[in-house]
Amino acid sequence: MAAALPPAAATWDDRGMPRTVYSLLFSALLPSLAHCGETIPTQGYTVVRTYPHDTAAFTEGLFYLDGHLYESTGELGQSSVRKVDLDTGEVLQQANTPPPFYGEGIVAWKDRLIQLTWRNQRGFVYDLATLAPRTQFSYSGEGWALTSDDRQLYMSDGTASIRRLDPQSLKQIGSIKVTARGKPLDNLNELEWVKGELLANVWLTTRIARIDPVTGKVIAWIDLKALVPDPDTLTDPTNDVLNGIAYDAEHDRLFVTGKRWPKIYEIKLAQ
C-alpha cells in the first residue's frame, strides 16, 4: 500500500480566511439555493357543478360523508356543527357551540365527530349520527382545522406546522413542517386528505396548497380567485374568504367554498 500523501496546504484569501472555508460554506448553502429556485406549478381546474350554501355560515370546517356535507361554522354565539343536504343546502341536523367557544375545524372518525375551537384550547366530541355531545379534550395553542387519513388525524393551528394526532386519544404524535420553495408556509387553515396528499387553504388568500405529507413541501397551488364572489355581495369582504374543502373519494368529487359564500363549487383538477 502506498504511503498516504500529506494534506495539501491551505490557500488563503486577502482577508486571511482559508479558501477551503468558503468552499464548505458554499456547499452548505447549495440545498437552500436550490429550494429558492424551485418553481411551484399552479394547477388548473374546471367547475363541474354548483350547489347552494348558507350565506350566514362562516365556514371553518367541511367534509363529505355518505352523501352529505358536514360543516362547522365560527364566530362567537354563531358557532355550530351541522349536517347539510348537498343538493339543497338544507341543514338537516345542528349542534350549537356555546360561548365563549369559537368553533373551528371538524373531522369524522368512526362514530365520532370531532371539533376544534379557536383559542380556547378545548375540543368537542359529538356522536356522528345524532350530533349529541359526548366529551371534551384539550390541546395547546390554537385550533384551526382537522382532516384524516385511514390511520391518524391532521390538525392545523395557523402556523406552518400541521400536527399529527392519535385518533383515539387525540394527543399529538408528530408534526409536519410545511414549506414552499424552502420557506415556511404560515396561515394554513382548512384541511382535506385527497389521494395521499394534504390540501390546505391558505388563510386570507385565494390559494389551496397541495402538500406532500412526507416531505411537507408544497407541490402545487390551486388558485381559486375566479370563484370569489363579487365583494359587494359579501357581508364582510375582508373576512369572507375562501375556506372549506371536502372530498367524495367514492365518486372522486372535490368541493370548495368560502365563509358566507352563496355557493359550494364542485371542481375537477386538471391532470
Regions found by a protein language model. Give the residues of each.
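Hydrophobic, well-structured mid-protein blocks that either form specific transmembrane helices
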Residues: 123-181
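A short beta-strand motif characteristic of beta-propeller blades
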Residues: 47-52, 90-96, 132-137, 174-182, ...
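Short loop/turn segments that connect beta-strands within beta-propeller blades
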Residues: 85-89, 127-131, 167-170, 212-216, ...
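Conserved beta-strand positions in repeat-built beta-propeller and related beta-rich domains
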Residues: 71-75, 113-120, 153-159, 200-204, ...
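Blade-loop segments of beta-propeller domains
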Residues: 89-124, 133-139, 143
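Beta-strand-rich domains and repeat architectures in extracellular enzymes and scaffolds
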Residues: 48-80, 96, 100-107, 258-260
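A short helix->beta-strand "capping" segment at the edge of beta-propeller domains
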Residues: 38-55, 86-90
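Beta-rich, blade/repeat-based domains predominating
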Residues: 55-66, 99-109, 139-150, 156, ...
